Swiss-Prot record:
It is found in: Cytoplasm. Bidirectionally degrades single-stranded DNA into large acid-insoluble oligonucleotides, which are then degraded further into small acid-soluble oligonucleotides. Its EC number is 3.1.11.6. It is an enzyme of class 3 (hydrolase). It comes from Chlamydia felis (strain Fe/C-56). Belongs to the XseB family. Keywords: Cytoplasm, Exonuclease, Hydrolase, Nuclease. Its main location: cytoplasm. This is Exodeoxyribonuclease 7 small subunit. Heterooligomer composed of large and small subunits. One of its GO terms (cellular component) is exodeoxyribonuclease VII complex. InterPro entries: Exonuc_VII_S (IPR003761), Exonuc_VII_ssu_sf (IPR037004).
Length: 75
């Protein structure tokens, strides 16, 4: 399931919430849906962490470049 795009995972999570809120959804179905939702949430959380790490890395790199350029101009 790790291959699913983030947006698709979020869309499926919304579908699961809708299904679980239906009175006609059985307990067994709700449990299966909950398990699927748990797996999807883990995937989404992992993708968000990776994106945050990448943004932090790019920001640090940009800041290092700016500091280096400022030092060059100061000399």
């Amino acid at each position: 399931m790790e291959e699913i795009p983030f947006e698709n995972a979020m869309e499926r999570l919304e579908e699961i919430v809708d299904l679980m809120n239906q009175p006609s959804t059985s307990l067994d179905s709700s449990l299966k849906l909950y398990e699927e939702a748990d797996a999807l949430m883990r995937i989404c959380e992992s993708r968000i962490r990776k994106a945050e790490d990448r943004v932090r890395e790019l920001s640090e790199r940009r800041n290092e470049t700016l500091l280096s350029e400022e030092e060059s101009f100061a000399h």
